[in-house]
Design a protein with these regions (language model features):
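Residues in well-ordered alpha-helical elements
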Residues: 18, 105, 149, 168-169
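Aromatic-enriched alpha-helical interface/lid elements that frame and gate functional surfaces
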Residues: 81-158, 162
Length: 176
């Protein structure tokens, strides 16, 4: 990838499922240890590391010569609410609205685009997917009006699921 390549869109649960397996194994092992020794254990896992582990299958496949189809550009994504967008400060955020019908009015309000809720082009999930190219353009124009920190407050404050594409400057303050 070059500097102009945007990140791949992730699938739901890409890190959550491996974390669940890691925690299951850690908890069962800790309980077994306690049963045998009478001593407890501290268990932990890491969403980021487990997400990387989950994606490692693709990396391994590539190492042995697998061929992958061309990735659809983000501007042509099939679903605008599970896509990434650039903020005013150049940072990228990734929307991940999996309960789209319920969250659509909230997202529209957060974007200051209440008009989208009643726009017949975007009335249903099916409509939004059919008009995803237009919706992506609208989102692009909207997200670029505020810095990432502002969008974080707005989206977090309204319970919308999103992620931030990390950069090296984030490492010292990353909670993971």
């Amino acid at each position: 990838a070059d500097e102009h390549t945007t990140p791949a869109r992730s699938i739901a649960g890409m890190g959550d499922h491996p974390c669940a397996m890691a925690f299951y194994g850690a908890i069962v092992t800790a309980l077994y240890k306690r049963e045998r020794t009478g001593k407890g254990s501290h268990v932990s896992s890491n969403l980021m590391a487990n997400g990387v582990w989950a994606a490692s299958v693709l990396a391994q496949a590539k190492l042995v010569g697998a061929k992958f189809g061309e990735r659809r550009p983000r501007e042509r994504a099939l679903n605008a609410v599970t896509n990434h967008y650039q903020c005013k400060d150049g940072r990228l955020l990734i929307l991940s609205l999996l309960n789209e019908d319920r969250q659509w009015p909230t997202l529209s309000r957060c974007l200051g685009r209440e008009d989208l809720v009643t726009d017949v082009r975007f009335e249903t999930k099916k409509d939004r997917h059919a008009q995803s190219l237009e919706l992506i353009k609208i989102f692009d124009e909207t997200f670029v009006t505020r810095d990432l920190a502002e969008w974080r407050k707005i989206l977090d404050g309204n319970g919308l699921v999103f992620g931030v594409v990390g950069i090296l400057d984030d490492i010292p303050t990353d909670q993971q």
